[in-house]
């Protein structure tokens, strides 16, 4: 289903709306402007009405475990609250970002006035690997005053559509600023029409998804890419204590390595292969132990796929310089190479050797892909290694357990996302 003018409509009605989309959005841009206060009040009201009795069943019906569903509902209430969003805007845009600023440039005698304006119409092409992402990316567009066209991810479970419907129902003034289209990525002719109606495209997802959007967009349409990134842990001898390793394993089990800030590879600060193999055995038992607290439930098809992948890894291990350590609901794979590569996910972790002297040149070969590093080291090493990781291109360093824990107003992939959704205009 689709959301047009605040109403849930079928495919045919969405296609009719798509034909008029340029005209409709132009009318909104000409006749209206969207105050951040209206968006904040609406989001806060939505946060207040979300409750377990009404909305927990919606999450449970999509196959989410009950404890996970409760956690996600609690997180949604926080992220939608006015207090949270105000702080996010303050951190990312500054306290007076929407107020005009007048000044006389050093090279002119006449004053100039600058102010922030929305880009106009944003097309959000959301990925399905992060809960609530379609809703949150639209809200970022609303906070900056933009009209938002959302193409739902194929795997969306209906929660995004319902939350945005509720938001527009709470504040009807948003109806001209939120459109949701349930079109398949293969329907290129329809996606192209959405692109043609947009001033900028916000694309989340894989390299293939980003490349596909680049091919669709004309040169004058701004691309705001939140593409595929890789994250890893770096472990030194001084960081190999039970608390650190259990925290890292807990993170791996909680995220199933599905997010851009999930640990794919554990790098060890050593050249000693025997030490690395010993680490593999010890960490596997920790991973198994933490896995019992967060049971892994996968569809039969996905479980079969993982089984085949692990079987293939085992068969090819000796010829590729690998050792596969199989456990109950988890595995670790020792690799002789030191490349940063994605794991097969779902608690199947890669272990590689990377002495700190080789850390920067190795990571520089993956520049543009680096996101979070979980640093497990001694206190006396932390400053030096943190600086080295930042110089290599990593954008966030934290503990292993906190790799996927965000905070209000944090940069995304090293950038302030809200700043990318505005433009600065000047009058002289």
Question: How would you name each of these model-derived features?
Answer:
Residues 174-265, 270, 404, 410-428:
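Conserved NAD(P)+-binding/catalytic subdomain of aldehyde/semialdehyde dehydrogenases
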Residues 134, 160, 211-215, 235, ...:
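Short glycine-/acidic-enriched loop or helix-start segments at secondary-structure transitions
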Residues 255-263, 267-372, 381-427:
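NAD(P)-dependent aldehyde/semialdehyde dehydrogenase
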Residues 144-149, 173-174, 193-200, 365-370:
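Short, surface-exposed connector motifs at secondary-structure boundaries
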Residues 1-117, 370-375:
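N-terminal Rossmann-like NAD(P)+-binding subdomain of aldehyde/semialdehyde dehydrogenases
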Residues 94, 99-170:
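Conserved small-residue-rich beta-alpha loop and adjacent elements
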Residues 108-126, 183-195, 329-345:
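Donor nucleotide-activated moiety binding/catalytic core segment of transferases
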